[in-house]
Regions:
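Blade-terminus and WD-like Trp-Asp/Gly-His loop motifs, strongest in beta-propeller folds
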Residues: 29-34, 68-76, 112-120, 165-173, ...
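PDZ/PDZ-like domain segments forming the peptide/carboxylate-binding groove
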Residues: 791-843
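A short helix->beta-strand "capping" segment at the edge of beta-propeller domains
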Residues: 19-25, 53-55, 301-317, 398-405, ...
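Extended, small/polar residue-biased N-terminal targeting/export presequences
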Residues: 756-807, 870-897
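Beta-strand-rich domains and repeat architectures in extracellular enzymes and scaffolds
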Residues: 20-46, 315-335, 622-638
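A flexible loop/linker signature enriched in serine peptidases of the S9 family
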Residues: 21-22, 40-46, 59-65, 78-90, ...
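C-terminal, low-ordered peptide segments at domain boundaries
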Residues: 297, 301-306, 561, 700-718, ...
Length: 901
């Protein structure tokens, strides 16, 4: 996008029409006859002769295809595809051709194996635990299902996680790897009680036998053609994943088959003739168990083009700020800076880089914008200015000039904020120190020394006082990390932070209010506290910096009105005492001054700070604690606006501080949103990711703020930036200075070479997980969350009996507070659902299609009681699977409480 992109000519795409050697080939599986290998590359499925050569592309959709599974006769390949928003199981001819969709539930469904007779495909998915299951209800812990290879009703095989299934020839037993927890599957060298083990399941007896049972990773089992030997992947002997084997009858007699170093062996499979096949370091190998590995030489012909995306989003801002005059909104979206008009959709793109920009601040002149950018590998401060004086604002500007401030390759500077007079710029240095830059002299002074903030994940909240002489900030006192307090410190530098809260609990989001005479903040001191990192409930609080402001706040409505009248009279009296000639001159000056209230506001009074007794001037504003978002107090100091979530998203609440009256002002259902006032306090801006709106504070009327973005994104450059970002973050902030013995630079180079072979976010997230997995720490890895399901499956709030094979669906349990848990329903356990919206459910029917896109819509359910032979109908409103998940959690908590009563 910019000149920096020129260095990206490192082969990010293959030359059109020419054969290239692929890397990062995943989901490798050899055919049953051992002549071909199927694999996934760049989101498509290919196959190649086992001896190597040019691979044949089998899928050509824009969607992502992965996990090819051969049928026993080698004539079909099952695979996963996200063509409908989530991963479903499909099947296609082994030579390519039209694929048939087999699963329709909106959860992710990933194929594992064909049954030996080829009639069914087993897959893992989180659809429904058995009603009697005691497992924690989470989508991370899947169940095992099977679906006919020709299509039809899904049946549950196991109610517990069972991955990488491998059948014996008779189909009576199968091997599988378990899953006990949430650890990233690509983590390496992990030893704990939740690492995977290999199990043998006997379908006749229902018995599960743990064959490995150790605190280390053992996974991906395959059975030898004679059924006597288990081959699997393991990190035994202190190395990375390699192929090992043991006799099925004597699982303790483990021996190594391969001895690869540095990187893991992945995706083990075996042909009917006993040829092993697997992936290593992005390439494919075959091997006879008693021989040495052979790399399969592969070429792929692709007509790849440079990856650019033209994005035209209408929402999705990740941060936003309003200009002082209230006429412009600056926001970041996908890491770029944009400015839109508050009244029109006209929008200007300010930055064009693959790097991330963040931390927006308008100067008082409304023509200068400060932000931080990580371009060049280090967070730096930038100023964007409207170049031509003829251009009225950013959205309509023709030329934008950009300037980097205090350039450095080692010191990070971010989170800029202009001083009220626009002459200085505050910022956070190296994520822990508050600094101020004089924009004229370029001199920098230190406000805090970094000893009061310990987190390096980002900066901290701070705010200038209206007179520019103070900062309020969140800080950590007495090394009480991570519990932050609210502080006050001089903007001149060299001063100590005064702790204004001393609560011992989380306090944050400070901002000045009441013309700088008080500080508004939120705290969990009265609500649910984050003792175990399960979240907290907060209140809005004020700390008054002087007694006069506190006394004024404490006045009743009547006394407050009397005080305002008295102040008016005193002002008039002061005018009368002035000599006549001076009075005339003063009146002329006052008239001129009153004609421009903005100029008057530009000269704020000095704030009086009285620290003595300040601990007694801390006031709780909100009547009850809540999941609280942004808070702000009106210009006149009489109204508190705050965002709180009691059900669903965040809604806007309004509180009259004098009358102590609170009401729901607007139902917003917002994700995140920040609230800001324009300079005169006439408009309140609600700036969120889902929508941005402007509210007239006199009428409370909302007006939408729209924008028109047409941005061209270099996707390959974005991925390279993210890769570099991860490298730097780990290098700077990994808790262990030796990086757990990993040569981080060498490992980074090893994984960087795969970037040209990745053109989608699924593969990129997996690459990050593999790479970060080398460090062997929890809570790391890459994640990609697609936009969502195109056909979300609704829930009836029921458990079904998976052993039932007749017409309809047999209810095993009605979940409390679900759609059927009503006073008027006749539905109970044992009832059969025969039809949904008049469509009969036959024994072999896939009924999930009848529930897709039905959440929150009236649905007719036809029911039958096998005991009384009665039939009837009920109209219910299905819920989302997310809502059903919440009900299951409440049910699980009650059941576990009953277990210990």
């Amino acid at each position: 996008m910019k000149k920096t992109f020129a260095i990206l000519a490192l082969g990010l795409t293959a030359i059109a029409g020419h054969a290239a050697t692929p890397l990062w080939m995943r989901d490798v599986q050899i055919s049953p006859d051992g002549t071909e290998i199927a694999f996934c590359y760049k989101g498509d499925i290919y196959k190649v002769p086992v001896k190597g050569g040019t691979a044949t592309q089998l899928t050509t959709q824009e969607s992502y295809e992965c996990i090819p599974i051969w049928s026993p006769d080698g004539k079909q390949i099952a695979f996963a595809s996200d063509r409908y928003g989530n991963f479903d199981v499909f099947v296609m001819p082994a030579d390519g051709g039209t694929a048939r969709r087999l699963t329709t539930h909106s959860t992710g469904e990933l194929p594992s194996a064909f049954t030996p007779d080829g009639k069914y495909i087993l897959f893992s998915a989180s659809i429904q635990d058995p009603a009697n299951s005691a497992l924690f209800p989470t989508s991370a812990m899947t169940e095992l299902y099977k679906v006919p290879a020709t299509g039809g009703r899904t049946e549950q095989v196991l109610g517990t996680p069972a991955e990488a299934v491998c059948f014996d020839k008779a189909g009576q037993q199968f091997l599988y790897q378990d899953r006990k927890g949430f650890e990233d599957e690509w983590r390496k060298h992990h030893t704990s009680s939740i690492t995977r083990d290999i199990w043998l399941y006997d379908a006749k007896t229902g018995a599960h036998t743990n064959l490995t049972n150790r605190e280390g990773e053992d996974r991906n089992p395959v059975l030898s053609p004679d059924g006597r030997t288990v081959y699997f992947l393991s990190e035994r002997n202190g190395g990375s994943f390699n192929v090992y084997a043991f006799p099925l009858a004597q699982p303790r007699e483990v021996k190594p088959i391969t001895s690869f170093k540095t990187h893991p062996v992945r995706f083990l499979s075996m042909s009917d003739g006993g040829t092993l096949c697997y992936g290593y370091d992005g390439e494919i190998y075959t091997q006879q168990p008693d021989a040495t590995p052979k790399k399969v030489a592969i070429e792929i012909v692709r007509d790849d083009q440079p990856q650019f995306a033209n994005l035209q989003p209408s929402d999705g801002a990740t941060s936003a700020t309003v200009s002082p005059d209230g006429k412009q909104i600056a926001f970041t979206l996908r890491g770029e800076v944009f400015v839109t008009s508050a009244d029109y959709a006209t929008t200007k793109q300010i930055t064009h880089t693959p790097a991330r920009e963040a931390g927006l601040s308008f100067a008082p002149d409304n023509r200068t914008l400060a932000y931080a950018s990580e371009r060049g590998g280090n967070w730096q401060l930038y100023l964007a200015k409207i170049a031509r004086k003829e251009d009225p604002n950013f959205p309509n500007a023709t030329l934008i000039e950009e300037e980097v401030l205090l350039p450095s390759t080692t010191v990070e500077r971010a989170y800029p904020q202009f001083s009220p007079d626009g002459k200085e710029l505050a910022f956070i240095e190296d994520r822990i120190r508050l600094m101020v830059l004089n924009l004229e002299t370029k001199k920098v002074r230190q406000i805090t020394d970094g000893s009061t903030w310990y987190s390096t994940s980002g900066g901290f909240d701070y705010s200038w006082s209206p007179d520019g002489k103070w900062f309020t900030l969140e800080f950590t006192g007495n090394k009480h990390d991570p519990y932050s307090d609210i502080g006050l410190v001089s903007a001149q530098g060299g001063g100590k932070i005064t702790n204004l809260t001393n609560s011992g609990y989380m306090s944050g989001y400070p901002r000045f209010a009441l013309d700088g005479n008080a500080i508004l903040f939120t705290t969990e001191r009265y609500g649910m506290r984050a003792h175990a990192s399960w979240g907290s409930l907060n209140d809005a609080m004020l700390v008054f910096l002087n007694q006069d402001a506190y006394d004024k706040y404490c006045l009743s409505k009547e006394d407050y009105e009397l005080r305002k009248e008295l102040e008016k009279e005193q002002k008039k009296s002061a005018g009368k005492d002035t000599p006549k000639d001076e009075n005339k001159d003063k009146k002329k000056k006052d008239d001129k001054k009153d004609s421009n209230t903005d100029k008057k506001d530009d000269q704020p009074k000095d704030i009086v700070v009285e620290l003595k007794g300040i601990e007694d001037r801390v006031v709780r504003l909100t009547p009850n604690s809540s999941d609280m978002g942004s808070t702000i107090i009106s210009k006149d100091g009489e109204t508190l606006y705050y965002l709180a979530a009691f059900e669903g998203g965040y809604d806007l609440w309004k509180m009259n501080l004098r009358k102590k009256e609170t009401r729901l002002l607007h139902k917003m259902n917002a994700g995140w949103a920040d609230m800001q006032l324009d300079k005169n306090g006439k408009n309140l801006f609600l700036l969120g990711s889902r929508k941005m709106q402007k509210m007239d504070t006199s009428s409370d009327a909302l007006t939408p703020i729209t924008f028109q973005v047409n941005a061209k994104m270099d996707l390959a450059a974005e991925r390279e930036y993210m890769f570099d970002h991860v490298y730097r973050q780990q290098q700077k902030r990994f808790y262990n200075t030796s990086m757990h013995g990993v040569d981080w630079d060498k490992m980074t180079a090893a994984y960087r070479r795969f970037l040209p072979h990745i053109d989608n976010n699924y593969d990129f997230a997996e690459l990050l997980s593999e790479w970060l997995g080398e460090l062997n720490v929890s809570h790391t890895g890459g994640r990609f969350y697609p936009k969502g399901q195109s056909e979300p499956t609704a829930s009836l709030g029921l458990f079904f009996d998976w052993n039932y094979t007749g017409k309809g669906m047999l209810i095993a349990e009605v979940v409390e507070k679900g759609p059927f848990d009503t006073a008027n329903t006749r539905v109970k356990a044992g009832t059969v659902i025969e039809k949904i919206d008049g469509v009969e459910i036959t024994p072999d029917a896939d009924y999930y299609t009848l529930l897709n896109n039905k959440a929150r819509k009236k649905t007719l359910v036809s029911l039958f009681n096998p005991q009384t032979k009665e039939r009837w109908e009920e109209v219910i409103i299905p819920i989302t699977n997310g809502a059903f998940s919440n009900l299951l959690y409440a049910r699980w908590v009650k059941q576990r409480a009953a277990d210990v009563d």
